[in-house]
Swiss-Prot record:
The gene is carA. Belongs to the CarA family. It comes from Bartonella henselae (strain ATCC 49882 / DSM 28221 / CCUG 30454 / Houston 1). Residues 210-398 form the Glutamine amidotransferase type-1 domain. SMART domains: CPSase_sm_chain. CDD domains: GATase1_CPSase. Residues 1-206 are annotated as: CPSase. This is Carbamoyl phosphate synthase small chain. PROSITE patterns: GATASE_TYPE_1 (PS51273). It catalyses: hydrogencarbonate + L-glutamine + 2 ATP + H2O = carbamoyl phosphate + L-glutamate + 2 ADP + phosphate + 2 H(+). Pathway: Amino-acid biosynthesis; L-arginine biosynthesis; carbamoyl phosphate from bicarbonate: step 1/1; Pyrimidine metabolism; UMP biosynthesis via de novo pathway; (S)-dihydroorotate from bicarbonate: step 1/3. It comes from the Bacteria.
Length: 399
């Protein structure tokens, strides 16, 4: 069914300057902000009330448009410290953003640029002034939607062409997006977490551990929390082979988050991960890294109905018996029924009982679906980094 949804009356305008055109033919009108042009992508909703800059720069959102359920986005502006993609000039992250209210002038002591100008520099197209919660309900009922977001300050759109492009885009399934966002060469990292009124600290102390981080679309705050454990980090591209990694003599290996279909990335990632498992080097994965680890042990991943995106998701850790509130950002999940006997499920989502963690019995190997580094979000799961380093210390004693 084709329909056009005008912007609600409080934000109504004479001529829309931005559109969201869904693959089913629905056209949603509003005001444009940020970059001009158009972009095809999957539309998801995020329920976080803060951290829009971190969300929009997370490489895991590659080829996605983020619909924010919180109405006021942009109030605190933007700054150079809250960006999450490894190389900001590459602008890896969301291609579009949807807000209920217009972007206002920022009010925050850390702000050095307003959101509208920042979106232009990041080449992110924004749609403002629509009923974002109605769109959220649509996604919840119909599942993740494919569509196209378009912005023209003059309001000139060829809607038929936009509809055809939206219908032609096939979605995230079978897309290996890690190759598009990964670093192109190895690099070092020594920045530690942010300190109030002091910014980010550099790890100049003598390092006790060497961690190799495989970059499938890694977030900066993950690296900072690893560096906080007296570790120096070597970041390597997603397709780095096992011989190159072992030659670096790591004390532990980290499998990062990232975008796209894990089954597509698995073609080159799984053989390396399987060899790492056999090496008995401690291994820790987050998000896409978790899914790739599951594929490496013979499990399967599946596309979710709507995915999990937000900073308020309850997860249970079966090891501690505790419930944690965590940040999540994924559209694929591990099929629990496909886990082999030597792999134990360690975490589940209390929203839908989907898998959120696993470990290999008898191996120093584990992973989680959620984001313990948060950024944005709660810090309930920070202990997982210590769990990783506990395994590393045990490994070094016997190595």
């Amino acid at each position: 069914m084709t329909q056009t949804i005008p912007s609600p009356k409080p934000w109504s305008i004479n001529k829309p300057t931005a559109l969201l055109v869904l693959a089913n033919g629905t056209v949603i009108e509003g005001k444009g902000a940020g970059a001009t042009g158009f972009a095809e992508a999957e539309i998801c909703f995020n329920t976080a009330m803060t951290g829009y800059e971190e969300i929009l720069t997370d490489p895991s959102y590659k080829k996605q448009i983020v619909n924010f359920t919180f109405p006021h986005i942009g109030n605190v502006g933007t700054n150079s410290e809250d960006i999450e993609d490894l190389i900001p000039l590459n602008c890896h992250g969301a291609v579009g953003a949807i807000f209920k209210a217009d972007i206002t002038h920022p009010s925050n002591y850390r702000a050095n640029e307003n959101l509208n100008q920042w979106l232009k520099k990041r080449k992110i197209i924004a749609l403002c002034g629509i009923d974002t919660r109605a769109l959220t309900v649509l996604i919840r009922e119909k599942g993740a939607l494919n569509g196209i977001i378009a912005h023209d300050p003059n309001g000139n759109f060829d809607i038929n062409t936009l509809k055809k492009r939206a219908q032609k885009w096939t979605g995230l399934v079978n897309l290996d997006l890690a190759q598009e966002v990964t670093s192109k060469q190895s690099m070092k990292w020594n920045e530690k977490p942010w300190v109030w009124n002091k910014g980010y600290k550099t790890n100049n102390d003598a390092s006790n551990f060497h961690i190799v981080a495989i970059d499938y679309g890694i977030k900066r705050n993950i690296l900072r929390l690893i560096a906080a454990h007296s570790a120096h980090i070597t970041i390597v591209p997603a397709n780095t082979n096992i011989e190159e990694i072992l030659a670096m003599n790591p004390d532990g290996v980290f499998l990062s988050n990232g975008p796209g279909d894990p089954a597509a990335t698995a073609n080159y990632a799984v053989p390396t991960i399987q060899a790492l498992i056999d090496s008995n080097i401690p291994l820790f994965g987050i998000c896409l890294g978790h899914q790739l680890l599951a594929l490496a042990v013979g499990a399967k991943t599946i596309k979710m109905h709507q995915g999990h995106h937000g900073a308020n998701h309850p997860v249970k850790d079966f090891i501690t018996g505790k419930v944690e509130i965590v940040s999540m950002n994924h559209g694929f999940t591990v099929d629990t029924t496909s886990l082999p006997q030597h792999v134990e499920e360690t975490h589940i989502s209390l929203f839908d009982n989907s898998n959120c963690g696993l470990r290999i019995i008898g191996k120093p190997v584990f992973s989680v679906q959620h984001h313990p580094e948060a950024s944005p979000g709660p810090q309930d799961s920070h202990y997982l980094f210590q769990r990783f380093f506990n395994l590393i210390m045990d490994y070094k004693k016997t190595a």
